């Protein structure tokens, strides 16, 4: 799945609406129960793989089941909302950290509030 195949429509209230268009799946409005922008790519890949497996191996799974499960899944420790305006994310590499920061910036793009980031890493992870 390439970035040209999915598009974020709206990021609001802890959810993301997006579209996915490729040779295996076309949908103009999917919803994720997360403000984590990076999960759009992950879910797009998962949906596409499910559709491909369904087609190649004639797996009996409804498209609605694929979309509903992707849209309602909560990734614990990945942009997980603890309370209002407090999120935890287990990003463990530079790309993951940058994706988290991009998601936070997107959440606060239209706000006069400022985001604060508390970061911690174990020495063994450096």
Model regions: which residues?
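Extended acidic/charged loop-beta regions that coordinate divalent cations
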Residues: 1-29
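Nucleotide phosphate-binding/pyrophosphate-handling subdomain across enzymes
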Residues: 24-126
């Amino acid at each position: 799945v390439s970035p040209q195949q999915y598009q974020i429509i709206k990021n609001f209230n802890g959810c993301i609406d997006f579209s996915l268009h490729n040779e295996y799946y076309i949908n103009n409005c999917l919803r994720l129960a997360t403000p984590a922008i990076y999960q759009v790519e992950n879910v797009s890949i998962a949906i596409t793989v499910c559709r491909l497996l369904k087609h190649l191996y004639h797996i009996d799974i409804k498209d609605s089941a694929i979309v509903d499960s992707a849209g309602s899944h909560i990734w614990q420790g990945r942009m997980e909302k603890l309370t209002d305006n407090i999120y935890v994310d287990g990003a463990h590499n530079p790309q993951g950290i940058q994706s988290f920061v991009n998601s936070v910036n997107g959440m606060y793009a239209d706000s006069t509030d400022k985001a604060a980031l508390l970061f911690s890493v174990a020495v063994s992870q450096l």
